[in-house]
């Protein structure tokens, strides 16, 4: 509905209309009317005051600050305008400007409010000692009657926030809990408590507090449309309203997503983000945008990079943004971009990167041009972390001997955190030799770390892979692959298809064909059950297992059986043909064509005919399937008509005809 214009409002009704709009939270319309009115009467105190209020409610804090600045200049005797200006500047994250305005306030009436504001500014700037000094001043009662005391809910929350920033999560939890008991349920305080529990790795109580926030938000504000997007219901944006902010629903869903992500429940993490009240992308807060980028990175990497790059230009941005963008550049092997971002943002390096993360990124970037130097850097980092792990192991043993449960829990948590730092360093070292196909050296690196990593799933998986690649250690590879598969046997499709395929090949190569067949029957059974619920869903596990087995026979020179296995594995084509499965299939065909062109093998006409028919089927079903998933930030894109399974299958068919001398 179009907004009212000033000319449509009857004489004498302007003020009433504006107040009605504000009462109904229609602040944008009120801003239009007030702005037009102020063009005619620019020194209207009432008009400017209402406009500032509307801007503040719309979270246009800089514009609100400008209005309050005008008011304080027009009425210097009314110091509350200067206070409101300082508060608006603080909300706009303009901390130096907010501090400057706050220092101009010397009215005793506002003393405690100014102290609170100054403490909040110092806290946001990272000056924790300065913030603590001001908070303690408030708690002592020095700031007047309304400054509160030790049991004042605001004071408890402030102390809780300081303790949280200082890393004292247990003590912070106690303060937030006491604040809730003193004031009753407050969504923002409940969120603070959940966040402190999360940071202390107490995920169950954190999720309990989050569930309470969400449940109350849904019950009290059904109009916010919680869960609608996940259910596929098309709903309009609820906007960034004050009500939404007061419910702490956005913060709660973001924290829930972070916990599920930490627990490797990636689907649940994505669902938490889509469950939150719907907003347009341009309305999203920085934390939600950051989390969306991370959790959809596998499916939409280009969008993910764009969002993180955008956030880096904002003030403020989530502190994790800088490190995560650099790590993702390294993951996707954009080392030059990572180096450029580090060089261009030296001021952010010291603020947002720990010494460990900086050294790790430096080594990863060095890998591209000087792998030997990178290995030495990583080795130094690994040595430092192994020393920490040994020290923490000793601490845990001593604490258990002394039956000090609190120290045990703290040391175990610290050990787990250090191990999570050590694993990426170890894998980066191993990858240097993996890229050189020096698998015995990779195995040697892993064996050196067995003391700390023998229970870590990532380590076990990579040990299995390196044993498998050596082709004479299939039995040892089974010893590492089997526990991974058995651990998830009741949900076998949650296991990576390549793990299942490598285990099957290892069984075959060690003459354990019955075990291989049993595993394949189990995969087939689960795929059938899944297809009953969703007949159109593409499931590739059994297909990839058969493709890898077919590849094995082709590698051994048995192309008749190997190629037939590859062809059968992709039936039916509409469900089995995809970018990954085509990758395995075309490798076998290229190997076959290479050997045919060298006249090292001869194929029966029936097999050649089978190959041609297979490629014709791929041509039909592969029109909309990319042959290659391009890198997300690739400047020169492949021709859209060439990057399809259809195009590549035609090329392979033409090569077959050329080699055997058939006329097309």
From Swiss-Prot:
Tree of life domain: Eukaryota
Any one Gene Ontology cellular component term annotated for this protein: intraciliary transport particle B
TPR repeats: 11-44, 45-78, 153-186, 188-220, 395-423, 424-456, 458-491, 543-576
A single BP term in Gene Ontology: intraciliary transport
Secretion signal span: none
Annotated compartments: Cell projection, Cilium
UniProt keyword terms in alphabetical order: Cell projection, Cilium, Cilium biogenesis/degradation, Coiled coil, Repeat, TPR repeat
InterPro entries: TPR-like_helical_dom_sf, TPR_rpt, TT30
Coiled coil: 507-534
SMART domains reported for this sequence: TPR (SM00028)
Xref: PANTHER family: INTRAFLAGELLAR TRANSPORT PROTEIN 70A2, TETRATRICOPEPTIDE REPEAT PROTEIN 30
Function: Required for polyglutamylation of axonemal tubulin. Plays a role in anterograde intraflagellar transport (IFT), the process by which cilia precursors are transported from the base of the cilium to the site of their incorporation at the tip.
Subunit relationships: Interacts wit the IFT B complex component IFT52.
Entry's family note: Belongs to the TTC30/dfy-1/fleer family.
Protein name per its UniProtKB record: Intraflagellar transport protein 70A2
Gene designation: Ift70a2
């Amino acid at each position: 509905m179009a907004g009212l214009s000033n000319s449509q409002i009857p004489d004498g009704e302007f003020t009433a209309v504006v107040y009605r709009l504000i009462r109904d939270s229609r602040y944008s319309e009120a801003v239009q009317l007030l702005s037009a009115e102020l063009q005619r009467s620019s020194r209207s105190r009432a008009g400017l005051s209402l406009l500032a209020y509307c801007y503040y409610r719309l979270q246009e804090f800089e514009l609100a600050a400008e209005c309050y600045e005008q008011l304080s200049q027009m009425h210097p005797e009314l110091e509350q305008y200067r206070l409101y200006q300082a508060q608006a500047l603080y909300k706009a994250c303009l901390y130096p400007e907010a501090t400057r305005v706050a220092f101009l306030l010397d009215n005793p009436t506002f003393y405690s409010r100014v102290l609170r504001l100054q403490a909040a500014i110092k806290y946001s700037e990272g000056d924790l000692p300065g913030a603590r000094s001001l908070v303690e001043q408030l708690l002592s009662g020095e700031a007047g009657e309304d400054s509160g005391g030790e049991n004042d809910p605001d004071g408890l929350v402030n102390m809780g926030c300081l303790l949280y920033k200082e890393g004292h999560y247990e003590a912070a939890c106690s303060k937030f809990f006491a604040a809730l008991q003193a004031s009753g349920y407050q969504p923002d305080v409940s969120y603070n408590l959940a966040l402190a529990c999360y940071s202390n790795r107490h995920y169950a109580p954190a999720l309990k507090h989050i569930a309470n926030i969400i449940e109350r938000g849904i019950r009290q504000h059904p109009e916010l449309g919680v869960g609608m997007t996940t259910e596929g219901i098309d709903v309009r944006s609820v906007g960034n309203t004050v009500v939404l902010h007061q419910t702490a629903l956005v913060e709660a869903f973001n924290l829930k997503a972070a916990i599920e992500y930490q627990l490797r429940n990636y689907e649940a993490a994505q669902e938490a983000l889509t469950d939150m009240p719907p907003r347009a992308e341009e309305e999203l807060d920085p934390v939600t945008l950051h989390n969306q980028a991370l959790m959809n990175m596998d499916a939409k990497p280009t969008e993910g990079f764009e969002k993180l790059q955008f956030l880096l230009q904002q003030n403020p941005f989530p502190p994790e943004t800088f490190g995560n963008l650099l790590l993702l550049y390294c993951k996707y092997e954009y080392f030059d971009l990572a180096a450029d971002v580090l060089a261009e943002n030296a001021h952010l390096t010291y603020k947002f990167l720990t010494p460990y993360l900086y050294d790790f990124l430096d080594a990863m970037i060095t890998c591209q041009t000087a792998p030997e130097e990178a290995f030495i850097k990583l080795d130094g980092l690994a040595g430092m972390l192994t020393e920490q792990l040994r020290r923490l192991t000793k601490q845990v043993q001593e604490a258990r001997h002394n039956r000090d449960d609190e120290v045990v829990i703290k040391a175990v948590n610290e050990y787990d955190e250090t191990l999570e730092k050590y694993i990426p360093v170890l894998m980066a070292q191993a990858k240097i030799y993996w890229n050189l196909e020096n698998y015995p050296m990779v195995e040697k690196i892993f064996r050196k770390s067995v003391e700390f990593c023998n229970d870590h799933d990532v380590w076990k998986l990579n040990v299995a892979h390196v044993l498998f690649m050596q082709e004479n250690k299939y039995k040892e590879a089974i010893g590492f692959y089997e526990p991974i598969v058995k651990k998830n046997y009741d949900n076998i499709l949650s296991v990576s298809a390549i793990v299942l395929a490598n285990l099957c090949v290892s069984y075959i190569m060690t003459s354990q064909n019955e075990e291989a067949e049993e595993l394949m029957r189990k995969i087939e059974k689960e795929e059938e059950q899944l297809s009953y619920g969703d007949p159109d869903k593409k499931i590739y596990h059994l297909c990839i297992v058969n493709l890898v087995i077919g590849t094995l026979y082709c590698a051994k020179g048995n192309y008749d059986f190997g190629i037939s296995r590859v062809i059968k594995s992709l039936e039916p084509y509409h469900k089995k043909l995809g970018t990954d499965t085509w990758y395995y299939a075309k490798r076998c065909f290229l190997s076959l064509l290479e050997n045919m062109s060298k006249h090292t093998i001869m194929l029966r006409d029936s097999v050649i005919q089978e190959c041609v028919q297979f490629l014709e089927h791929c041509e039909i079903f592969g029109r909309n399937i990319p042959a290659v998933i391009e890198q997300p930030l690739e400047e020169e894109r492949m021709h859209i008509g060439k990057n399809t399974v259809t195009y590549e299958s035609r090329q392979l068919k033409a090569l077959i005809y050329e080699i055997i001398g058939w006329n097309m």
